[in-house]
A protein has these predicted regions:
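Non-catalytic cap/lid and distal C-terminal segments of serine-dependent acyl enzymes
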Residues: 1-210
C-alpha cells in the first residue's frame, strides 16, 4: 500500500518505487497479459517528476518517458541538477515527451515551474545528452488539471503517427503498410510489425473494393 506519495514520487525515495516496478510489477503484468516489450511510462505533476527521474535513474526500464506538467521545480530544481550530472551520457535512443499547460495560466509557483521546463528544454536542444530524443509540447488552452488528458491523446498521435494509415493510401500503394512500419521502427529503434488482425481486416476490405 502506498503510504507516502511524496516519498515514492520524488527523487530521494523514488528509486525503491521503480525497483518494485522492475522486479515485481512488470513481471506480474507480463504473466497476466500478452505484452510487447516496448514500454511507456506516463506521469502528471508529481508523478511526472517521477517519470523524469525514472529516465535519469532507470533509463532502460522504459522506451518512452512521458511527463505532463512535471514538477521539476521540486526541492530547488533537484531534477535539473540530476540532468546536469548526466551530461554527455548515452540514453540509448530513449524518448522524453514533456507537455505543459499554457503560460497564461498563473497560480502560485507557476513562473518557477515554467522556468525549470525551459531550462531542461534548452539542455536537450543543445544536445547535452547522447541519443536522447525529446519533444516539448505546450497546450496554451489547457491548465494543470487538464493538460494530461489532451497530452496523452496527442502523444499517441505523434509517437505512433506512422501507424495511422488512410485506407485510400493503401488502395493506391499496398506497400505503404510495410514502409510505414519500417519508418516507425527506425524512429523508435524498436522492431514494430502490424498485428495479424489488422492485416486480415485490411485484406478483407481491399477484397471488397476489388
Amino acid at each position: 500500500r502506498n503510504t507516502d506519495r511524496e516519498r515514492d514520487l520524488t527523487p530521494e525515495g523514488n528509486g525503491r518505487f521503480w525497483q518494485f516496478v522492475a522486479d515485481e510489477l512488470r513481471p506480474w503484468v507480463e504473466k497476466q497479459y500478452r505484452c510487447a516489450d516496448f514500454r511507456i511510462v506516463v506521469g502528471h505533476s508529481l508523478s511526472g517528476l517521477a517519470a523524469v527521474n525514472a529516465l535519469l535513474t532507470h533509463s532502460t526500464l522504459f522506451n518512452v518517458y512521458v511527463a505532463h506538467d512535471p514538477s521539476l521545480w521540486w526541492n530547488d530544481n533537484y531534477a535539473i541538477e540530476l540532468f546536469k550530472q548526466r551530461k554527455g551520457d548515452d540514453f540509448q535512443h530513449r524518448l522524453l515527451y514533456i507537455s505543459h499547460s499554457g503560460y497564461k495560466v498563473r497560480h502560485n509557483g507557476r513562473s518557477r515551474h515554467i522556468e525549470t521546463l525551459n531550462k531542461l528544454q534548452a539542455m536537450t536542444a543543445k544536445g547535452d545528452f547522447k541519443n536522447l530524443n525529446s519533444l516539448f509540447v505546450e497546450y496554451p488552452d489547457e491548465n494543470h488539471g487538464t493538460v494530461q488528458v489532451v497530452g496523452n491523446l496527442d502523444l499517441l498521435r505523434r509517437v505512433f503517427a506512422e501507424m495511422f494509415i488512410d485506407r485510400n493510401d493503401i488502395e493506391e500503394n499496398p506497400q505503404i503498410i510495410k514502409q510505414r512500419y519500417e519508418a516507425l521502427s527506425r524512429k523508435l529503434h524498436y522492431h514494430f510489425t502490424p498485428s495479424e488482425s489488422y492485416l486480415k481486416n485490411t485484406a478483407r476490405w481491399a477484397a471488397r473494393q476489388a
